Amino acid sequence: YIEEEYYENGKDKVAFFISTNVGEDEKELSKIASGGEMSRMMLAIKTVLANTDNTPILIFDEIDTGISGKAANAVAEKLNQISGKHQVLCISHLPNIAAVADFNYFISKSVVNDRTSTSIKQLNEQEIINEIARISSGEVNEVTIKYADKLRNKKIAS
């Protein structure tokens, strides 16, 4: 569509229209997509533009919302790919995505004296393995640690 108003950077404004299901009419992406879907659409665009885009830092907030399995692996692969040209910050709850990160941080909230505070801790490699194990099944045991280690080693090998 065409905007007739002028903005600080001109009068061009872009809207993406997509059909998310066979037989459905195209609708404006910003009106029908969830936050996770918007992040994945941005990832797709940034992947295509990775070699020409000068944006130094890309932030993806919960890009893994509503996905798992092969879709999560594909997102992890694309994040890893664009991280070669950009600094990527990604908030994730999926082991597949956490496993490909060069650095992992654990963010936690606590209540002290009726005040909520947030803390962040950079994880060392063993802590990364343990956290990937925890988010993969809710517990840390021999099986989940082996799985987490396999995911991390797959990342290191690629």
Regions found by a protein language model. Give the residues of each.
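Internal helix-turn-beta structural module
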Residues: A15-F16, I32, R40-A44, I128-G138
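Short, contiguous acidic/charged loop-to-helix segments that flank catalytic cores in large enzymes
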Residues: L29-S34, T65-I67, I120-L123
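Walker B catalytic acidic pair
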Residues: D61-E62
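SMC-family hinge/dimerization module
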Residues: Y1-M38
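Conserved D-loop-proximal element of ABC-family nucleotide-binding domains
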Residues: K27, T52-D53, T65-N73
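GG-anchored amphipathic helix commonly corresponding to the ABC/SMC/Rad50 NBD signature/C-loop
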Residues: A15-F16, T20-V22, G36-L58
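C-terminal lobe/lid and adjacent interdomain/linker elements of RecA-like ASCE P-loop ATPase modules
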Residues: K70-S158
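Short loop/turn elements that form and flank the Walker-type P-loop nucleotide-binding site
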Residues: G10-D12, T52-N54, S83-K85
